[in-house]
């Protein structure tokens, strides 16, 4: 039973002539991109891949080579044009339906891709024929998968390469082999079923429907071949017709077995008679096919007519006689005539598989990518892809900027709400009648600034700096005066023989600059004195501000007049105690809510930074190229952008959740604050606070005024110290330069005396004069 599969049809491969990619490809790259681009190794690897694909074995390795070359061609088609203005290369392929004709020659890359796909179909069909003839469960599975892929690729060829040249790429021929290979895949299922089940538990009804489906596919194949112009190879039509008849016969046979299991002898006998008639016709059709045909598995074809004959004479005829005998003696069922038999509904067990599933459905995509390998020319990005990527980058930038603006708006809103609620002021109010005196917030801020400055020490430092600088100037002037005196003495003793330049001329630039500094230092000292006098006016207030106990002492008298804290706890009404407790709970809740809102800020900032990095690193070049490959099913640019931008949704949703949470927390803070301000105890404390504020208003105003004056003084002192620092640095430079110049003049004087000693007899007198020089 399992060897009743019909002889399997397969395709011969298209032959090709040598096409060298190296020279035209190199020329194109040099012309467009210049000689600086080095892709020689990639071009050679691509050329070798074509040479390998031109002559592959009927093995899995051969399939991988063909698919790898096709994948690289697919990559190439999106990066470089071919033909006159592109890579000037032509391809020559044979036509398997017209082997004696000249090779078809074209420069189209689509023609090259179609021919490679055709050879992939032919290789899969030959592998399927070899597997199916082994008659094992695993071989039937492998054959079925090959045929599913072959039919799927044939469909792709027919739909994607409409105007491909050659009869073997004709639309009707491709439609024919699509149906033929898919029909043979159904036969593999029947072969698998016959091995997996015995006669007693085989699902004959299902087998009948699958066989009917195969017969229908073979019938469609016959119509497609007959529609070709010029006519297709008649042997193709004979084989498809014979296979159709055989599968119709087997469908009737399987349905008969199904009816026998249901004890419907009349129907079973009718189907058996129909099967015998159709299978006899199929046997004659197979006998009419020549054994020299090179597209059918020959061992199967030579044995198959005898196999059908044996099946008809033994299994089928024996079953028919047994059924007729049982019907005559037991069932007495009316035998249904052949024309009245119900038509068997076809059920296609296996669909065609697209090229994307050539290596399986689960991990097939990753496997296919490994087979193809990296794009050899991925460094060359098509201009259309570059333009689209640039537009997409603008869209991602818009997404980020929108979220950045919203984050800033939310932070501003939070700060505004905090300022309006002023939690610290609410806390001041609630503590306004406690024994522990509070210092107003404005005074606390002023106090912190003054403590960090320490005005008294800084003013003393001003005067010390001024005095020090004046001493440095006096020292420099003294050095100049000593040098002038020595020079004058030597001039008086030696007269014209003393050639050293005049000291007044030498010292003039130094004296001028030093006098200017003395003048400005005098003005600065006057300013320092004015600052000191001004600070003396506010010194007491500043010292008071810097000492919290002094402030408390000043405020104590006004507080005592409104203080009720002297009451015993037993004297406080229960209602007031409850209000006090509620007020404390509300304040604690406000602090907690404020803390929770503030924690949202760093979380938002971290999420925003992650969004920025994701936007900057996002690259959809590969997606754009893959989308271009889909052709009719390709998305337009806006749709693709919309789909790609969804990858940012998790981060954006996290930000939006933060916004919503902030709104809820701020609303809750507003509600709690409103309840707090309606609390009678809070209203009482607010009245106390206002009384304290009004009584201490003048005191606070004076202290704040003094703090502002002290702040202005601190700024003046800082500028003065900065000025003195600049003057000190300049005086250090003057002192260094002057020291070097004085040393040089003394050396010049020594040289002058040395020359005089060689021409004068009064050596002792000159030596005495030399000792006067303090070298």
From Swiss-Prot:
The segments labelled Disordered in the record are: 755-775
User: Which is an annotated Pfam family here?
Assistant: BRO1
Specify the BRO1 domain's residue ranges. Answer: 7-414
Record key words, sorted: Coiled coil, Cytoplasm, Endosome, Protein transport, Transport
Purpose of the protein: Involved in concentration and sorting of cargo proteins of the multivesicular body (MVB) for incorporation into intralumenal vesicles.
- Disulfide linkage: none
* UniProt organism field: Schizosaccharomyces pombe (strain 972 / ATCC 24843)
| An annotated GO BP | protein transport to vacuole involved in ubiquitin-dependent protein catabolic process via the multivesicular body sorting pathway
List GO terms (cellular component aspect). endosome
What's the encoding gene here?
A: bro1
- Keyword Cytoplasm included in the entry's annotation: yes
Q: Where is the composition biased (Low complexity)?
A: 755-768
| UniProt similarity note | Belongs to the BRO1 family.
Coiled-coil stretches noted in the UniProt entry, renumbered to this chain? 574-601
Q: Which InterPro entries match?
A: ALIX_V_dom, BRO1_dom, BRO1_sf
As for subcellular location, the record says: Cytoplasm; Endosome
Q: What is this protein called?
A: Vacuolar protein-sorting protein bro1
Tell me yes or no: is Coiled coil among this UniProt entry's keywords: yes
